């Protein structure tokens, strides 16, 4: 996991020379529930944490728009992105804990749309604040979307020992 997505490195250095010289041919972005797309309602909080937004025009909302922008930059590596559960969640409700039914419906609709538009899969992470607030119900629902489209649902766990089976 190279973090080329989080810091907009894929746009700032599309050739990704350092990775190519090391033999890396593919980057899978959007790990740990954080992705560059979709950015619903124009929310940029997920991106702003890692990158200076003055360096690139983040001009996409939907995953298809992100993919089009990426294609224009002609990356030097294969680049696939997961749709981030925490990114969607944060865009919908900020830091509140539980999604209401309508909000969950929006989250699932947007995740499904992102996969239809080319997202490689879905990612969640229970170690980050947004992911840690997610209910089992919404995580299972995202898993069902991944199954529906036969794509991975990658889940990051921060605690590999204590509390893992709780």
Segments and roles (model prediction):
Residues 5-7, 57, 101-102, 133:
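Residue-level marker of alpha-helix boundaries and capping positions
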Residues 12-121, 150:
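Divalent-metal coordination cores built from histidine and acidic residues
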């Amino acid at each position: 996991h190279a973090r080329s997505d989080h810091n907009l490195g894929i746009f700032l250095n599309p050739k990704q020379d350092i990775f190519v010289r090391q033999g890396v041919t593919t980057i899978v972005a959007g790990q740990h529930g954080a992705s560059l797309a979709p950015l619903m309602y124009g929310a940029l909080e997920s991106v702003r944490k890692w990158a200076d937004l003055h360096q690139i025009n983040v001009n996409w909302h939907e995953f298809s728009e992100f993919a089009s922008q990426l294609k224009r930059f002609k990356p030097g590596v294969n680049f696939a992105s997961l749709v981030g559960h925490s990114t969607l969640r944060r865009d919908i409700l900020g830091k509140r804990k539980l999604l209401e039914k309508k909000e969950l419906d929006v989250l699932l609709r947007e995740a499904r749309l992102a996969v239809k538009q080319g997202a490689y899969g879905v990612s969640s992470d229970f170690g980050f604040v947004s992911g840690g607030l997610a209910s089992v119900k919404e995580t299972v629902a995202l898993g069902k979307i991944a199954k529906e489209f036969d794509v991975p649902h990658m889940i990051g766990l921060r605690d590999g020992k204590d509390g893992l089976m709780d």
